[in-house]
């Protein structure tokens, strides 16, 4: 029996860019869909990390000892806006659960407290976001620009996010697994 592909476009879905997508930031992107409604959609790119360190002058931290904090480019829209994607369920009034054990939200005091601890929840500090107008994401999906997979804690906070796109395609199996080996630049093949 052939495995039926995941095809639910909703909060908690992962969007995987088709190998044909070569639109800059979206090339081989994995996006966690955080909101999807009749009014539009928004999500955060998980596998485009930024080589930043927490700057004391920006965040007013005395010290940063938590290695569970990762900087990500959430998307091309409002790149100066920061969103917290984390695994801490202890601040439910400020957060929205996106999928089991993955939350969106929080404030600077939460971030400061976590950054100063030796351990703690996983945090993706996402700068910017990816957004679609009403009906736009559905059209892109139907045009084959995106594949879908269910989100999970393990995918969202994977140790090597640069390998996330290939990992999920392999996990989906079948034709998707073979797509995971397509080189980024076909002209170099």
UniProtKB/Swiss-Prot annotation:
It holds the Pfam family DUF179. It comes from the Bacteria. Gene3D superfamilies: VC0467-like. InterPro entries: AlgH-like (IPR003774). One of its GO terms (cellular component) is cytosol. Belongs to the UPF0301 (AlgH) family. This is UPF0301 protein CF0373. It comes from Chlamydia felis (strain Fe/C-56) (Chlamydophila felis).
């Amino acid at each position: 029996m052939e495995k039926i592909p995941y095809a639910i476009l909703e909060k908690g879905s992962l969007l995987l860019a088709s190998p044909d997508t070569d639109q800059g930031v979206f090339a081989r992107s994995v996006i966690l869909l955080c909101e999807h409604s009749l009014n539009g959609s928004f999500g955060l790119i998980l596998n485009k990390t930024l080589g930043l360190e927490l700057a004391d002058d920006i965040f007013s931290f005395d010290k940063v000892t938590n290695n569970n904090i990762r900087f990500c480019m959430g998307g091309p829209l409002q790149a100066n806006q920061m969103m917290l994607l984390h695994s801490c369920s202890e601040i439910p009034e400020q957060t929205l659960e996106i999928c089991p054990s993955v939350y969106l939200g929080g404030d600077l005091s939460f971030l400061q407290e976590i950054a100063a601890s030796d351990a703690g929840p996983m945090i993706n500090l996402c700068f910017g976001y990816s957004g679609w107008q009403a009906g736009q994401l559905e059209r892109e999906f139907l045009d084959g620009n995106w594949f879908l997979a269910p989100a999970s804690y393990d995918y969202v906070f994977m140790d090597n996010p640069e390998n996330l796109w290939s990992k999920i395609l392999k996990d989906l199996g079948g034709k998707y697994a073979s797509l995971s080996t397509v080189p980024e630049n076909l002209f170099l093949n």
